[in-house]
């Protein structure tokens, strides 16, 4: 299945669930007791693209002000969840340098990767921007990460939740019941091909993060310039 068809399938399946009130309300977003943390390799889109995302979100905020909208500081693409978030993960108990070294081996110099953010898709939990890669570089990196980490003796949980192959970015999460569901779905449908632009990937970040990649909890472990 092509990436475009994957996003379309996900969109239609999720819209059906949202329409029939089978969507997932995240009750942990506002919880003071959420102790889920992990280790993730991420890409951050350009400031220009983040500005377009915030402009895009304005109309949704007017219709559904009580949902969770990602600020610019938290918008990201997950390259790989190296340690998927779990309660009370303690970074002091791992050898951080080993994670940096293993990751660096997988990020070859001269990577030529552009990502186009065009259109939106959905999940039963929220709304995502569709990301399209100009080549196989990103998935090649993921395959190298899988090989290196699975052949190592460090703690890891690659692909534990799902086999990641996309370049999407979550921008809305449902934290309350949709108060104007029909208007929200109509706006989604009208925005399905929204063009956010293209950016060149020139760095990757290895971060310690909470489930939502919120700035106040994220600690940058290492930045890899490619």
Residue positions per predicted region:
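Histidine-dependent nucleotide/RNA phosphoesterase domain, centered on the 2H-phosphoesterase fold
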Residues: 1-226
């Amino acid at each position: 299945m092509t990436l475009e068809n994957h996003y379309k399938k996900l969109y239609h399946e999720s819209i059906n669930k949202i329409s029939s009130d089978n969507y997932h309300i995240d009750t942990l977003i506002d919880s003071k007791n959420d102790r889920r943390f992990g280790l993730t390799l991420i890409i951050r889109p350009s400031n220009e693209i983040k500005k377009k995302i915030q402009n895009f979100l304005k109309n949704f905020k007017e219709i559904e002000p009580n949902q969770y909208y990602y600020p610019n500081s938290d918008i990201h693409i997950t390259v790989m969840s190296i340690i998927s978030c779990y309660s009370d993960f303690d970074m002091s108990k791992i050898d951080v340098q080993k994670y940096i070294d293993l990751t660096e081996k997988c990020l070859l110099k001269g990577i030529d990767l552009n990502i186009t953010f065009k259109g939106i898709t959905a999940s039963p939990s929220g709304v995502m921007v569709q990301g399209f890669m100009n080549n196989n570089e990103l998935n090649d990196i993921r395959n190298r990460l899988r090989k290196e980490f699975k052949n190592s003796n460090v703690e890891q949980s690659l692909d534990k939740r799902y086999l990641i192959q996309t370049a999407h970015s979550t921008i809305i999460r449902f934290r309350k019941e949709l108060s104007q569901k029909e208007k929200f779905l109509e706006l989604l449908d009208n925005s399905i091909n929204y063009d956010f632009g293209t950016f060149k990937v020139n760095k990757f970040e290895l971060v310690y993060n909470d489930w939502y990649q919120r700035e106040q909890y994220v600690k940058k472990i290492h930045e890899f310039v490619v």
